[in-house]
């Protein structure tokens, strides 16, 4: 069944503290100074049918981000439905609650199957082509990249390790924090699949997650550092048989921006003759 009518849900509510506070999705990484967001949209165009672009933002970055989203949408005539919501930060916290909160906060705006994406990541046109050709719109998928394709140099990163049964149904996600490439063997780098927050989900998942999130917040109401990590909440829904997900393996190349130094390496990846945009 070929995927049709997908909403894009971009997470962009973070503070970008390791990036000087500027929205990473506005980094100019394309051969003609295109932003990361425009390059991301370019990877999806003609591979999936986009009916809505929704962005989770914060109060500080809202205007800059939405200006770029609208500009790119108008330039490429992508869709008529551009929406956003602000991920609120309680007074007792300096940062948002986390990725699960960002995703859940969009629940009032998402009414069709959607692709969840990090706004500062690029997932490769090949990945979206396979999603468009092979994914069943009625199911939930986590798109897995090999561990090695998502780790570079000696920079630390967080990755959700994916465990599946013999039918490729996801049975557990294990979030590992501050890992480096050197921690793992070549076999693990080539064969362990991880999530970098690219998922195809049904809108009902958002309501289920919101219920879990409310409980989490009530338990950590005085903890300014507690973080609602998306893999943990997906795990909880799977254990309760509320959510069933399949692993969709991609051989696409992931690129992401966390630090200022990453901008140049991502730009070089797109300028490489081997790179398909």
What function would you assign to each model-found segment?
Residues 8-10, 55, 116, 142-143, ...:
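Structural beta-sheet core signal
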Residues 26, 161-164, 247:
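A structural signal for short hydrophobic beta-strand segments in well-ordered beta-sheet cores
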Residues 18, 64-65, 126, 233, ...:
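Phosphate- and divalent-cation-binding pockets in alpha/beta enzyme and binding domains
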Residues 60-84:
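Acidic donor-binding segment of Leloir-type glycosyltransferases
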Residues 2-4, 173-277:
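Conserved alpha/beta core of the MobA/IspD/sugar-nucleotide pyrophosphorylase nucleotidyltransferase superfamily
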Residues 124-204:
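Conserved core of the sugar-phosphate nucleotidyltransferase
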Residues 79-161:
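Conserved beta-loop-beta/alpha segment of the NTase-like Rossmann-fold superfamily
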Residues 2-68, 91:
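N-terminal glycine-rich phosphate-binding loop and ensuing alpha1 helix
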């Amino acid at each position: 069944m070929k995927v049709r009518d997908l909403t894009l849900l971009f997470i962009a509510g973070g503070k970008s503290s390791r990036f000087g506070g500027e929205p990473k999705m506005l980094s100019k990484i394309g051969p003609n100074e295109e932003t990361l967001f425009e390059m991301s949209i370019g990877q999806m165009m003609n591979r999936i049918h986009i009916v809505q672009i929704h962005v989770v933002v914060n109060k500080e970055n809202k205007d800059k981000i939405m200006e770029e989203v609208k500009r790119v949408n108008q330039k490429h005539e992508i869709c008529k439905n551009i929406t956003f919501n602000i991920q609120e930060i309680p007074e007792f916290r300096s940062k948002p609650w986390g990725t699960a909160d960002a995703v859940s906060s969009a629940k009032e705006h998402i009414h069709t199957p959607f692709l969840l994406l990090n706004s500062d990541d690029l997932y490769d046109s090949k990945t979206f082509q396979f999603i468009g050709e092979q994914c069943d719109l009625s199911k939930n998928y986590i798109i897995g990249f090999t561990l090695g394709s998502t780790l570079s140099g000696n920079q630390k990163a967080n990755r959700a390790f994916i465990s599946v049964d013999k039918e490729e149904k996801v049975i557990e996600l294990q979030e590992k924090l501050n890992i480096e490439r050197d921690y793992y063997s070549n076999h693990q780098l080539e064969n362990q699949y991880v999530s970098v927050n690219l998922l195809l989900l049904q809108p009902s998942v958002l309501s289920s997650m919101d219920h879990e999130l409310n409980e989490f917040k009530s338990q950590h109401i005085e903890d300014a550092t507690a973080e609602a990590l998306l893999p943990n909440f997906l795990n909880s829904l799977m254990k309760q048989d509320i959510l069933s997900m399949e692993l969709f393996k991609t051989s696409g190349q992931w690129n992401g921006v966390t630090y200022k130094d990453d901008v140049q390496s991502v730009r070089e990846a797109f300028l490489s003759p081997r790179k398909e945009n």
